[in-house]
Regions:
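Phosphate-binding glycine-rich loop
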Residues: 56-98, 116
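PLP-dependent aminotransferase class I/II
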Residues: 204-246
Length: 246
């Protein structure tokens, strides 16, 4: 069993996911218990009376092309907040596991962890050195109960990138030991290129991406979790069946 699976909660490995109604336009969808008529004013192509496709194939493929990854390594989520929640539910056991984050940073990492009953370990960024991450301090503080390590780069709210050398050192040291999550919500506004090609190097690495910022689609709530195909399959066991809207 690879580390992506062995780090997960045992229950997730055996849970039977919700079986959503088959999504084929050619079907007469009596099995989905949907209203057969459209509501007044509905001008959508798919029809608001119908459940949406859980993972729209066209959207998955377009996002995979945009981020330079294969479709099997991408899950479309209801904003990147949902991806954070999914990772917490997959990997964190209440009262046993922990996350690590570099503060100050985006608040949802710790919110999702605390909802799951996990400990939150904080490694302060070094303000005197441009809010850089202290790699040695982070690695010294890590212990096997830390299942998720969040690295927001560019960081919210300090706006700085954490540095390729620092991120690479953390990924190398924790490969196979923890899920390292690099949040690239603001990467389009950075001088640094996305590090998503590292997925081929580090199986326990994951990325968060979103269309909310540079693409000005915050109201559409379209995010993505990028990771090893086994991680994406675990997430598909946990994600609500119709979290994306038509």
């Amino acid at each position: 069993m690879n580390a992506v699976l062995s780090l997960a909660r045992p229950e997730i490995l055996t849970i039977k996911p919700y079986s959503h109604a088959a999504w084929l336009p050619s079907l007469t969808r009596l099995h989905a218990n949907e209203a057969p008529w459209r509501p007044t004013g509905d001008a959508t192509e798919a029809g608001l009376n119908r459940y949406p496709e859980p993972q729209p194939a066209g959207l998955v493929q377009r996002l995979a092309e945009l981020y330079g990854v294969s479709a099997e390594t991408l899950l479309v989520t209801h904003g990147s907040d949902e991806a954070i929640d999914l990772l917490s539910r997959i990997y964190l056991r209440a009262g046993l596991d922990a996350i690590m984050q570099c503060t100050p940073t985006f608040g949802m990492y710790q919110v999702a962890a605390r909802i799951q009953g996990a400990e939150v370990m904080e490694i302060p960024l070094d303000r005197s050195r441009g809010w850089s991450v202290d790699v040695d301090r982070l690695l010294a503080a890590w212990h096997p109960r830390v299942k998720l390590v969040y690295l927001c780069s560019p960081n919210n709210p300090t706006a700085n990138s954490l540095g390729i050398a620092a991120l690479e050192a953390i990924c190398q040291a924790l490969d196979g030991k923890a899920i390292v999550v690099i949040d690239e919500a603001y990467i389009e506004w950075s001088n640094s290129a996305s590090l998503t090609p590292w997925l081929a190097r580090f199986p326990t690495l994951a990325f968060l991406r979103t269309l909310s910022k540079a693409h000005a689609l915050a109201g559409a709530r379209i995010g993505a979790l990028l990771g090893h195909p086994d991680m994406i399959q675990l997430a598909k066991r946990v994600i609500p069946p119709y979290s994306l809207t038509t």
